[in-house]
Amino acid sequence: MRKLVYFVGMSLDGYIAGPNDDISFYPVGDDMWDWLKAQYPETLPTHIRPHIGLAVDAPNRKFDTLIMGRGTYDPGLAIGLTSPYAHMRQYVVSSSIGRIDDPTVELVDSDPVGLVRRLKQEDGMDIWLAGGGKLAAQLLGEIDELVIKSYPVVAGTGTPALAGEFNPTLFAPTKRTEFGNGTQVTWLTRA
């Protein structure tokens, strides 16, 4: 069965973005860019691939489906991108967008848990939960694995990785890797 994987970057204090969805403060070194391109190419938006030496049609390695909330979708939309990950099936969970004018992006206005349960039953690669924090909190019971890119920076405020009710949920670390600037990636599975 497919897994729902929350693959996300965050600050040391647990924020996935700063004010106004800013992620520019994360220190991403060349070694990490190379790792992302080799191991998780599908997590890099289609429009930036040519600018970082990655073929637009580079094959997906882990995920073929993406679920994101409005806060994750809006930055691309603000620069005219209606399909930021054209190389994947894309779902945007939002009750406030109204409609999406792109047939390759499906709007889900209710029941994200039901969506994930249906997708898990389908054949295919794993499902990438890209954010944001509110959606991740709604889907916490369905998250099978966390892949946390922990950057060596404190944000102070912003969008929390999980913005919901108090809900202690155990995950067990299975692997960790570190990059030259101190950024760490930790894989955790539901305990």
Cite the ranges covered by each PLM segment.
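Enzymes that bind and transform nitrogen-containing heteroaromatic metabolites
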Residues: 1-191
